[in-house]
Amino acid sequence: MKVHRVVFREVDRDKYNEVVQGLKTIETRAATVKFKDIAAGDKLNFVCGKDVFEKTIASVRHYSSIDEMLAELPYKKILPSAKNRADVYEIYWSFPNYREKIESCGLMAFLLR
């Protein structure tokens, strides 16, 4: 079991709070080298500013695209604030360099318990 640090920008504190409150039960990240080897049973150490919260990963999935991920996982468990699927894209594209990272690496989905 390993512990991995996942940082939320202060501007994204709402998403950090959704993890803490149990509303966001699936954390996703671009499948870059930093995230692609994370396994079930590992822990994610969520950090936002000085706040830290830890969750255990129940399972891990890799998707080549947002479409592939949304065909299998409910978007409300990934981005509870999203109003619809189009909103999911808008939120993802708002993160720095995410479009390019997802197009080249895909997405990792960490189902939390």
Feature-to-residue mapping (PLM):
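Compositionally biased, charged N-terminal/linker segments
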Residues: 1-38
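Contiguous surface segments at macromolecular interaction interfaces
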Residues: 70-113
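Short beta-strand-centered aromatic/proline hotspots
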Residues: 52-62
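Catalytic phosphate/metal-binding cores of nucleic-acid and nucleotide-processing enzymes, i.e., regions
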Residues: 30, 34, 54, 77
